[in-house]
From Swiss-Prot:
GO terms for biological process: cellular response to estrogen stimulus; response to estradiol. Residues 17-655 form the Vitellogenin domain. The lineage of its organism: Eukaryota, Metazoa, Chordata, Craniata, Vertebrata. Precursor of the major egg-yolk proteins that are sources of nutrients during early development of oviparous organisms. It comes from Acipenser transmontanus. Residues 1089-1232, 1252-1280, 1636-1659 are annotated as: Disordered. Found in liver, testis and undifferentiated gonads of estrogen-treated fish. Not detected in the brain and spleen. Disulfide bonds join C1492-C1631, C1515-C1674. This is Vitellogenin. Residues 1123-1145, 1636-1649 have a biased composition (Basic and acidic residues). Phosvitin, an egg yolk storage protein, is one of the most highly phosphorylated (10%) proteins in nature. Keywords: Disulfide bond, Glycoprotein, Phosphoprotein, Signal, Storage protein. Residues 1-8 form the signal peptide.
């Protein structure tokens, strides 16, 4: 036994070849691409040959291929046979048969040597054969794993070794995970701007690759000999979840030993060079697109043919083949040399149409040759600035980067002599940063040569303090995104550089934003920097907010997020706190896999923070994040909106919107837009007069010089700026300054003679302008190339190409003709006739490919999606602004026009370069597979099991199974395709055309119900515009006309018979009375339900008698009235049934809870109940109150989301209701007893509120009078029933008509009428058909019925009687809060509207949850929708939404505009609708202004902070002032000498020194520049007209809006200062900084924070006001 063990240990398992023999193997390699199921088309190829291996030196062997043959496959798998590719075999035979040498030791293939004549493609095929010999045998283990080298790289391999002693063989099984590689061979193109979603890949992978090998080894004296080797490799791809199916590329190899002979082998005479290892070497497939194959020996000729085809066939409108032809042109240019491109350019540079196509195709070619040509043309000034910008920037983003290309770009971009155009240089610098990003994408540390030009440019700009170039350098460094650039960026970050704090805030923000792309490589370093910036409270709030945004984008750890939350607990800036808190809270709702860890961390952090931050209004900075991720699709999208505000103004200082996409286990930022509006609000509020032209205010400046620690707010140079990013790279940015605005205003006002551009355009339009525009674009080229085991590259790629064309012909006739002194403003008052013939069209071609791609052969699967749209527009527009007329006239549709065409089809393709005419392209879903299920026969279970057994034999066919016998066997299972066809047309008979839709779809979803299988197949749909011919006269032209003003009535063609409307009013009882009935507010109608139910029959009979009496006038109206009567009866019956049902439901609910009510406390029993009982027994309640009662009774089931919070808020409602409710309403008492939530309260309109207060105790006696009062209201007057067109002309008329050949007209007309009475404004809109016999109409009527109620009714159909919807808006109270109720109610709506309602109802709960609404299942009226908005505080409202099946509510919703509310508002009546609408502009305007009040020793700052301060006597304090470098006003306050309770005010505005002094008589004195102005002479206006002084109440009011002072009021005791919106964040003094930062209100002039308001002022500098009056000025800020 010992001897046997020792012998077994000496056995060598490593494969080897004897040096004296030549081994001949039979080799076969097959690769196929398609879906895994049988019965569908596949494409692939087979390579089989003889292989001889012999030793030529120590451990060096010679491999020679004999009798190679290549066969192609394209057909139904596995039925179709392989067919020989004879021409391709013949072309490659000379290379395939050339011997190669390789090193082979212990089963490992070393270096490979081959002749230079052998191409990389052929050598890779030989590597595939050698890969079969790669074995790593361990004698000490039978099962083991390791990282093994191979053709695909160094990947994880698992071995299992079995020894069969009886058969004297060793079986080795090897499997490789091609997704787990230390060094994976792959090539990614077009993915540099996306990054991997690691969490997505943990869940599912879109691509997987695996390989399995089986070896049979025969022991020999020197080791083992490989007698047979088989391999199977599978790559799968799906854009969706892999569990739902994927397309596969399957490769198989088989190497079988046939003979071993003792033959002397001669070494080849030609020199064999080292061509690398066994790893795959990329070759020509990098430049070879997988969708086209052609010979490139003479590309110039082919390029000219393609160019000619594109130019000639895409002038009028784009052709469907234009995108594919453009891709072909791009591929041909990739094969060109520099001389070829030069020759083509010289031939076509003078021809504008050809020139444009060439300049668009060269950047898409993206080769070094094309880029070099573009740079030479720019340096030689052969391109215009517009052409250079477009061509160079696109080329820099698409070109394949290497060291030479980067160096070439740097020499061009950073040499000012080359790029003299500022716009071109700006975009080129940004593009250079993006180029560096792609060049250094695979390495952590980028080469210094690439970054040096950017670093030098940044250092130079910062050293020269050049603001614009510094911003450009920072943005370029941000595009590059390299960690080595951090040191340059830190020079602009405060806290890291001594001079950075002096830079403008915009530069500091841009420096922080430049760290975002760097964080993708060095997240830890960026987190450290941004955290340090965030913690520095001395920095500007905007810088800190952007730092927190960048920090959270790096997805910090739980510990770092907790540190951030801890810092927020001590945060003094409300802007920073609001922004960061809202950002973290928004992330907690994220469902994207990439944010799982961050979402959990933020969820914990938010719980640590105060809920008060949730209640900050929208004046404070906010961050919003919304995303969705669908796991079945493994795709998602996200949107981020960051709103940054500096001074709590309505207009934010910055807005950033970013959109993200999750697809194919990667994340990309396709679009980001940023807008910075700092300084824009100030310009909008100011006049055009320049502040710089003001005379110096000497006294103010003299005081400012003496202020210790003065720190003026920096003035803005840039009013607004914007940028756009695509895929994380900033493409462009622009800035708006005062100079730009002045130039724009000047361009409008100056005569055309001085405006050369406008004059040229006007003259060209008068002569007639014609243009043929075309713009091709390679939208996407995304590729991944992987090697396969047989040595051919497998490619998965996506191409999107688009071509847009526009044929434009425009001619204008202007009356009167423009003269030399004609300006743009006068041009708008001319009569302009514009003849336009424009045909825009666009074609797009998307191709997804999976398969083999080389320069000699291509096989695989292609999915083609084509889209084409054409919108021909030929019309004549007439514009006459003086007459207020606009008219468009066009010809009718004469022939069928395909407006939109979409098609998608999957193919199995195979083509080789030697026989392009024999290329095959078969649908993946064959036609014979589409069979009707009715033709299928039922098979029993036995037959089915036999069929599966037979089919199982072919589940994994090996190379031997691919014989001719199998291909022709009848065992193949037939498939049937899912087939669907749709078609529909919508006719516009009045205009003689129809829009038709046709769709057809066939897919393979019958195999597997998944998104991928639904795409695979054939799909086609189109939308066409067709002429619709009728038996009547033909249509000659179509006209659209809009007329406003006094001539609107003249455009009305058909005058509607007014008696039909009058009759309808009489039968239905007055349109507004019906409206009032539909829109009765809950609790408003005091008639009991029972009494209303008993009166229904009499009401119906009276209505019938009324209709019958009116019907006796004519027989035609009789039939009409009978129809209307039936409809009315049906409506009433429906309403009665619903009212009875709601009443009974409410009654049952009350009975169930009667027992519970009797157990309430004693003081609850003492509440007035007589009125409740009488109301329930005699008065009853209407349907609305019943519904409310039912809602109230069911309101005790608190919402699951936040029971405690909701309950506490409901107590607030209870307390408010207890304090304000004085009526004896039983519903009120019940509500108080139940502690109801918001949805349980009944909304009480203003009239209902007054009615119960005035008539309590006499409910029964007042019901009839209330009813009569209601009937006598304004809604029931005869005057309201009239048609407004009888007494006033329409305010506008719109006519859409078709003029027929017989002179008649048909179409539609719309007219609007108004009644401008102040008390009850009213609007009516009437739309009718022009044809006299048509009764179709749309009637809309809206009226402000009272100060508290507005109503609108819309009816449409035959004489406006088929459908109707009513809407009302009523003010009132919800509990004790002023409220507004908007209610919509309908009786009949179209079926399409009902379907839309049902669809929306499915998404409402989810959307409401995302918006923070709570939900309660409640059966509300089925034909009613209600929204109630209750004002609970000046900054918040409660929202209640009642839909038919659900109730939604949200409390404390922040609103951007502060609503002025006094404490006594709870006891007063609600504001009326008229006052609300009138006050809305005032509220918005007031919300932009700030007010400060000082009375005795009490102060209220601009931001609402209250404090007390005892001023020392005789010392002036700065109450409020303009805190910028150029001070425009200052208001000072001191204690009057005559009394401690009186104050004296001094205001310095512009060049005026205004003193307002108290007197002992209780009045005030006014002095201007030390000259007393009697109050009797007020009002006063200075010479400039900017300062106004007037008497107000008991004091004086000063207004100087031009200088930022809205008003200054003083009456001797109280001072009130109100500043304009432009002064947000620009004031200082005792009134504060007016920036919304309540926690930082007591900042001192040098920026330090005081401990509180009670700190006594330090002795300030004293200044003599005059030589005789010594008045000290104590500087307090």
């Amino acid at each position: 036994l010992t001897i046997a063990l020792v012998g077994s240990q000496q056995t060598k398992y490593e494969p080897s070849f004897s040096g004296s023999k030549t081994y001949q193997y039979k080799y076969e390699g097959v690769i196929l691409t398609g879906l895994p199921e049988k019965g569908l088309a596949r494409a692939g190829l087979k390579v089989h040959c003889k292989v001889e291996i012999s030793e030529v030196a120590q451990k060096t062997y010679l491999l020679k291929i004999l009798n190679p043959e290549i066969q192609e496959y394209n057909g139904i798998w596995p039925k179709a046979p392989f067919y020989p590719a004879s021409k391709l075999t013949q072309a490659l035979a000379s290379q395939l048969t050339q011997p190669i040498k390789f090193q082979y030791r212990n089963g490992q293939v070393g270096d490979i040597f081959a002749s230079e004549d052998v191409s990389d493609t052929v050598l890779n095929i030989q590597r595939g054969i050698l890969n079969m010999l790669q074995l790593t045998i361990k004698t000490t283990q039978n099962v083991y794993g390791l990282q093994e080298n191979g053709i695909a790289g160094i990947c994880e391999a698992s071995y299992v070794i079995q020894e069969d002693r009886k058969a004297n063989k060793i079986i080795v099984t090897k499997s490789k995970d091609l997704n787990n590689c230390n060094e994976k061979i792959k090539m990614d193109i077009g993915m540099a701007y996306s990054h991997t979603c690691s969490n997505c890949r943990k869940i599912r992978k879109n691509t997987r690759g695996t390989a399995a090998y089986t070896y049979i080894l025969k022991p020999t004296d020197t080791g083992t000999l490989i007698t047979q080797a088989t391999s199977q490799e599978v790559h799968q791809l799906t854009p969706f979840n892999e569990m739902t199916g994927a397309a596969i590329t399957e490769a198989r190899q088989k190497l079988v030993l046939e003979d071993a002979k003792v033959i002397h082998v001669t070494v080849p005479e030609q020199e064999l060079k080292n061509r690398g290892s066994i790893q795959y070497q990329f070759a020509s497939e990098i430049l070879q697109t997988p969708i086209q194959l052609f010979k490139t020996r003479s590309p110039e000729t082919k390029i000219k043919e393609v160019l000619q085809h594109l130019v000639q066939n895409n002038q009028q409108q784009v052709q469907s083949d234009a995108p594919s032809k453009f891709l072909q042109l791009t591929q041909l240019l990739r094969a060109c040399t520099h001389e070829n491109i030069e020759g083509i350019w010289r031939q076509y540079e003078k021809t504008q149409l050809y020139r444009r196509w060439i300049l668009d195709a060269l950047p898409a070619a993206a080769t070094p040759t094309a880029f070099r040509f573009i740079t030479q043309r720019i340096m030689k000034r052969d391109l215009t600035d517009a052409e250079a910008i477009q061509t160079l920037v696109t080329a820099m983003h698409l070109v394949q980067t290497n060291h030479q290309i980067v160096q070439m770009a740097a020499e061009l971009v950073f040499d000012r002599a080359n790029l003299k155009c500022p716009v071109l240089r700006k975009h080129a610098v940004l593009a250079y940063g993006s180029m560096v990003n792609r060049y250094c994408a695979e390495t952590l540390n980028c080469r210094e040569e690439a970054l040096k030009p950017l670093h030098d440019f940044a250092n130079d700009a910062i050293s020269r303090a050049h603001e614009e170039e510094t911003v450009l350098a920072l943005k370029a460094l941000g595009n590059a995104g390299q960690p080595s650039s951090i040191k340059r960026i830190q020079k602009c970050l405060p806290g890291f550089s001594s001079g950075a704090s002096q830079l403008p805030v915009k530069i500091q923000v841009d420096a922080v934003m430049a760290l975002r792309n760097i964080a993708k490589k060095e997240p830890g370093k960026v987190q450290e920097l941004t955290m340090q910036l965030f913690m520095d409270h001395q920095l500007h709030s905007e810088v800190r907010m952007v730092a927190s945004m960048v920090l959270l984008e790096t997805r910090p750890s739980m510990a770092l997020v907790a540190t951030l939350a801890e810092a927020l607990l001590k945060e003094t800036s409300l802007q920073v706190a609001s922004f960061t808190y809202s950002h973290m809270k928004a992330i907690t709702r994220s469902t994207a896999p990439e944010n799982h860890a961050l979402s959990s961390a933020c969820n914990v952090a938010v719980k640590l923070l105060s809920r008060k931050l949730d209640r900050l209004s929208y004046r404070y900075s906010k961050a919003m994040h919304m995303d969705t991720f669908k796991y079945p699709l493994m795709a998602g999208a996200a949107a981020n909106i960051h709103i940054i505000n500096n001074a709590a103004s309505i207009l934010p200082s910055a807005v950033v919107m970013k959109f993200q996409a999750y697809i194919l286990s990667a994340t990309a930022d396709p679009l980001e837009i940023g807008l910075h509006t700092e300084g824009l609000q100030e310009v909008l509020m100011q006049n055009h007069e320049h502040i710089d032209q003001m005379p110096s205010a000497g006294k103010i400046q003299q005081i400012m010089k003496m202020l210790s620690g003065w720190k003026s707010v920096p003035s803005e140079k840039t009013l607004a700026s914007a940028y756009i990013k695509l895929f994380g790279q900033e493409i462009s940015f622009s800035r708006l300054d005062k100079k730009t605005i002045q130039e724009a205003l000047q361009a409008v006002r100056e005569p055309v003679e001085r405006q050369t551009v406008i004059k040229r355009v006007v003259n060209q339009l008068e002569r007639g302008a014609a243009a043929q525009l075309s713009k091709p674009l390679l939208v996407a080229e995304v590729r991944r190339i992987l090697p396969t085991c047989i040595g051919l590259p497998m490619e998965m790629s996506l191409y999107v190409s688009a071509v847009t064309t526009a044929d434009i012909n425009v001619q204008a006739h202007i009356t009167p003709s423009p003269t030399n002194d004609f300006n743009v403003a006068q041009l708008l008052n001319s009569n302009i006739v514009l003849h336009t013939d424009v045909t825009p069209s666009i074609a797009m071609h998307t191709i997804a490919v999976m398969g083999i791609n080389t320069h000699v052969i291509q096989t695989g699967v292609e999915l083609h999606v084509k889209a084409r749209t054409t919108v021909p527009m030929k019309f004549t527009a007439k514009i006459d602004l003086k007459e207020k007329n606009f008219k468009i006239e066009s010809e009718p549709c004469q022939q069928e026009t395909e407006v939109l065409s979409l098609s998608a089809q999957a193919f199995a393709i195979s083509r080789n370069v030697e026989d392009l005419d024999a290329a095959k392209k078969n649908p993946l879903l064959p036609e014979e597979a589409v069979r009707n299920i009715l033709n299928e026969q039922f098979n029993s279970g036995t037959e089915d099991s036999n069929e599966r057994e037979r089919a199982g034999k072919f589940a994994r066919p090996s190379a031997e199974m691919m014989s001719q016998e199998l291909m022709n066997s009848g065992e193949h299972q037939n498939r049937k395709g899912a087939h669907a066809t749709r078609s529909a047309c919508a006719k516009a008979k009045n205009f003689g055309f129809e829009v038709c839709f046709e769709g057809k779809s066939e897919n393979v979803a019958f195999l597997r119900d998944s998104p991928l299988y639904k795409i695979i197949g054939q799909h086609h749909c189109k939308i066409a515009l067709k002429p619709s011919h009728s038996s009547e006269a033909t249509i000659e032209k179509i006209q659209l006309e809009l007329q406003t003003g006094n001539k609107a009535a003249s455009k009305i063609i058909r005058v509607v018979a007014m008696q039909s409307l009058a009759e309808a009013d009489e039968m239905k009882g007055n349109i507004l009375k019906k409206l009032n009935k539909l829109l009765t507010v809950d609790g408003e109608t005091q008639d009991s339900t029972l009494r209303g139910f008993k009166r229904r029959s009499s009401s119906s009979s009276s209505s019938s008698s009324s209709s019958s009496s009116s019907s006796s006038s004519s027989s035609s109206s009789s039939s009409q009235q009978s129809r209307m009567e039936k409809r009315m009866e049906q409506d009433k019956l429906t309403e009665n049934l619903e009212r009875d049902r709601d009443h009974m439901r409410g009654k049952q609910s009350k009975n169930k809870k009667q027992e519970w009510k009797n157990k309430q406390k004693k003081h609850h029993k003492q509440l007035p109940s007589s009125s409740s009982s009488s109301s329930s027994s005699s008065s009853g309640s209407n349907s609305s109150s019943s519904s409310s009662s039912s809602s109230s009774s069911s309101s005790r089931s608190h919402n699951h989301r936040n029971n405690t919070r909701t309950l506490s808020k409901s107590k607030r409602y209870q307390n408010n209701n207890n304090s304000s409710s004085s009526s004896g309403s039983s519903s009120s008492s019940e509500e108080i007893q139940k502690n109801p939530e918001i949805f349980a309260y009944r909304f009480r309109s203003h009239r209902d509120k007054l009615g119960f207060q005035n008539k309590r105790g006499r409910m029964s006696s007042s019901s009839s009078s209330s009813s009569s009062s209601s009937s006598q209201s304004t809604l029931n007057s005869k005057q309201d029933a009239k048609f407004l067109g009888d007494s006033s002309p329409p305010i506008f008329a719109f006519v859409a008509r078709a003029v027929r050949s017989d002179g008649l007209q048909q179409g539609y007309q719309v007219a609007a009428y108004t009644d401008n009475r102040v008390s009850r404004p009213r609007v009516q809109l009437l739309a009718t058909e022009i044809i006299e016999k048509s009764r179709w109409q749309i009637c809309a009527d809206a009226i402000l019925a009272s100060n508290y109620k507005a109503m609108a009714l819309m009816r449409w159909g035959e004489e406006c009687q088929d459908y109707k919807v009513a809407v009302s808006a009523v003010t009132g109270r919800l509990a004790s809060h002023p409220s507004l109720q908007i209610k919509a109610k309908w009786s009949r709506i179209p079926r399409a509207a009902k379907q839309t309602q049902n669809i929306l109802a499915e998404y409402v709960p989810g959307a409401a949850f995302m918006l923070g609404f709570s939900q309660k299942e409640q059966r509300n009226p089925s034909k009613q929708f209600k929204i109630i908005l209750a004002v609970t505080s000046p900054n918040t409202i409660d929202t209640l939404i009642k839909a038919p099946k659900i109730t939604l509510f949200k409390q404390a919703v922040q609103i951007p505009v502060q609503i002025p509310m006094e404490p006594s508002d709870a006891e007063r009546r609600s504001p009326g609708l008229a006052s609300i609408m009138n006050e809305i502009p005032f509220l918005i305007e007031e919300a932009t202004k700030s007010k400060c009040v000082a009375q005795e020793n009490k102060f209220i700052t601009f931001d609402g902070v209250k404090f007390s301060y005892q001023m020392p006597g005789g010392c002036y304090h700065i109450l409020a002032q303009d805190c910028r470098s150029k001070v425009r006003f200052m208001v000072m306050l001191k204690q009057a000498s005559m009394s401690k309770n009186l104050r004296a005010v001094n205001a310095k505005i512009y060049n005026k020194d205004i003193d307002i002094l108290p007197t002992t008589k209780g009045s005030v004195r006014l002095l201007i520049n030390n000259n007393e102005i009697p109050l009797s002479q007020l009002p006063f206006t200075d010479s400039s007209g900017n300062i106004h002084i007037k008497r107000a109440d008991e004091g004086v009011s000063v207004s100087a809006q031009q200088y930022g002072l809205e008003s200054l009021y003083f009456d001797g005791k109280t001072v009130q200062v109100k500043v304009t919106s432009e002064m947000r964040g620009k004031t200082c003094g005792l009134c504060g900084h007016n920036d919304g930062e309540r926690r930082k209100e007591f900042r001192m002039p040098d920026g330090r924070q005081a401990r509180g308001p009670s700190v006594s002022p330090t002795p300030g500098l004293c200044l003599e006001k005059t030589a005789t009056e010594a008045a000290s000025f104590c500087v307090i800020m």
